[in-house]
Amino acid sequence: MTVEDLTFDVEQHIDMKATPEKAFAAVLHRLGKGNTRPDGQSLELELEPKPGGRWYRDRGNGIGHLWGFVQAIKAPNLLELCGPMFMSYPAINHVEVKIEPVSGGCRLALRHRAIGMIDPEHRKNVGTGWNHMLSNVKKDCEQR
């Protein structure tokens, strides 16, 4: 097994016609109650937007899955999350979302790094999931 087998590092960004404040609110929504799979099905996520706040999936009837914790939050420019996320095996993840003003709006940059016994399917599809989330943030900001 190599280091590459045990890690991944995904970076994506998207520009949008929105203030950083509006984009940050949309990020919180899309990482929480507004998070969906690409087929539109809700992931039933909750995000407590405060240092140490939980990020978890609540399926009801006491069924759930801890995705992580808020490591840092500096609205409207930075959100960092860390934890197992969707990986039910030995792994740790760090997700960093940065928002900065640019001409005509703002840029949202996302970086997801992981280390552990990474499932090849997760490695293959994680970028698609983040692209879906970023597209929804942009749509939320530009349609309102």
List each language-model region with its residue ranges.
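Hydrophobic ligand-binding cavity/cleft-lining segments
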Residues: M1-S42
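Hydrophobic/aromatic beta-strand elements that line small-molecule binding cavities or substrate pockets
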Residues: Q12-I14, W67-A72, N93-P101
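Hydrophobic pocket/interface hotspot
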Residues: A23-V27, W55, V70, L81, ...
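Glycine-rich portal/gate segments that line the openings of hydrophobic small-molecule binding cavities
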Residues: S42-P84
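Short, highly charged C-terminal tails/helix-capping segments
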Residues: E44, K139-R144
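Beta-strand/loop substructures that line and gate deep hydrophobic ligand-binding cavities in soluble
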Residues: M85-H132
